[in-house]
Design a protein with these regions (language model features):
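Conserved mixed alpha/beta catalytic, RNA-binding, or beta-rich assembly cores of soluble enzyme
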Residues: 2-46, 55-400
Length: 400
């Protein structure tokens, strides 16, 4: 009988991870125990993928920082006076504790929020209402008074939070003066202060470049705050505060660091135990967008901070329905099946980009695709499966 199952993604349960735990041992043991289960076990094969969420990696590393640690670094880098904080995302989990730290490191915060939504799609206001009011988001800079006059007190549809009031109260509770404006041009902050933290994620380099070109004096992106330990805190030399999550009211879990040696150690340990060459990666947010809530999931700086060499690159695939409807339109049944399998088998290693037979396939990085699959598999709640085991991802229609 020919093979009938393609890609399979499994959530693998693991113990609750604490600081100092040996994650190489835990992940390897969890995968081997899952594979050996009598009812729903599986055979480990070459080119399977083991992935673990960044959260358990950072927890095992003890990569945490406090509000006071953030405040000390902000004060050291920006001077402790008036600081512009621009383009933050609207999130209690992702940004609120970071904002508390920033506020404790300054005397006054000028908060500049993008509108009608933040970078990842959390809406402050309804775009249709914005249009009705005649507001041009590309040019208009709104004060708080004008914003309230036009749009009133709006709350996030999922969380029920008025993020404007929430962020301003949070700043004041930390002892800093708070002022808020609404704009989408980074340069709009400069009449208020020349010292800026730009909090955008995927556009941060361009934003910083434009601010400096326009005369800003001190500009730091979030990935430049806590790039080294402060009073023994955690840190991330590459991403700073990007990718943080709330741990407690006063601490954040930072994005994990030094992950490459860990994924390679897990790969070796699994090979020693099974004789199979398995790929390994760490994943964070998936790179997908909710079509209803309009939220782009990717609030981390990257989908995968570390992965083994076999996960480098992009897919190189043929579009089966194109072949069936065009090249082999006159064939049916087994003859069609064999013709398509022959075309797939004839692929060489050269790129198919620009070739009609690949039109409609997915020219995205493997780690972004697989990381998104992992994020959807593990979820973000109480499934208890921070490890994902994927089989058949690199197979195709010819694989038996």
């Amino acid at each position: 009988m020919s093979r009938m199952v393609g890609t399979v993604s499994r959530g693998v349960r693991a113990p609750i991870i604490r600081s100092g735990d040996d994650l190489v041992e835990i992940v390897t043991k969890s995968v081997l125990e899952a594979a050996a289960q009598p009812e729903d076990g599986f055979a480990i094969r070459d080119r399977d993928v083991v992935a673990m969420t960044e959260a358990i990696v950072a927890r095992a590393q003890g990569n945490y920082a406090s509000v006071d640690d953030i405040a000390a670094d902000v004060k050291e880098k920006l001077g402790g006076e008036t600081v512009g904080v621009i383009f933050p995302i609207l999130s209690r989990n992702r940004f609120a504790v970071c904002l508390r730290g920033i506020a404790k490191g300054a005397k006054k915060i000028i908060l500049m929020l993008s509108y009608p939504s933040d970078e990842v799609g959390n809406h402050l206001i309804d775009p249709d209402v914005m249009d009705e009011k005649g507001v041009d988001p590309y040019r208009d800079v709104l004060t708080l008074e004008k914003y309230r006059e036009l749009f009133g007190y709006t709350v996030h549809p999922f969380t029920g939070v008025d993020y404007v009031a929430y962020y301003m109260d949070l700043i004041r509770d930390c002892g800093a003066e708070a002022e808020v404006i609404f704009a989408n041009d980074a340069k709009a902050i400069l009449p208020y202060t020349k010292n800026v933290i730009n909090c955008d994620i995927h556009t941060r380099k361009r934003t910083k470049r434009r601010l400096i070109a326009a005369g800003a004096e001190k500009v730091f992106s979030l990935d430049e705050i806590l790039t080294a330990p402060v009073n023994g805190s955690g840190y991330n030399e590459n991403y700073g505060l990007l990718g943080t999550n709330k741990a407690t009211e006063d601490t954040v879990k930072l994005f994990p660091r030094d992950c490459q040696s860990m994924v390679e150690a897990i790969q070796k340990k699994l090979y020693d135990a099974t004789g199979k060459h398995v790929e390994v990666m760490v994943y964070g947010d998936g790179a997908f967008k909710d079509p209803v809530g309009k939220i782009w999931e990717l609030a981390d700086p990257v989908v995968s901070p570390a992965y083994t060499a076999g996960l480098e690159g992009t897919p190189n695939e043929l579009k089966l329905k194109y072949l069936a409807d065009n090249d082999f339109a006159g064939l049916n049944g087994e003859e069609l099946r064999q013709a398509i399998k022959g075309r797939i088998a004839a692929k060489d290693g050269s790129s198919l980009v620009g070739n009609m037979v690949s039109e409609g396939t997915t020219p995205r990085r493997l780690t972004d695709l697989i990381g998104s699959l992992c994020d959807l598999t593990s979820g973000s709640g109480d499934k208890g499966t921070p490890i994902v085991y994927i089989q058949g991802y690199f197979d195709n229609y010819t694989t038996e």
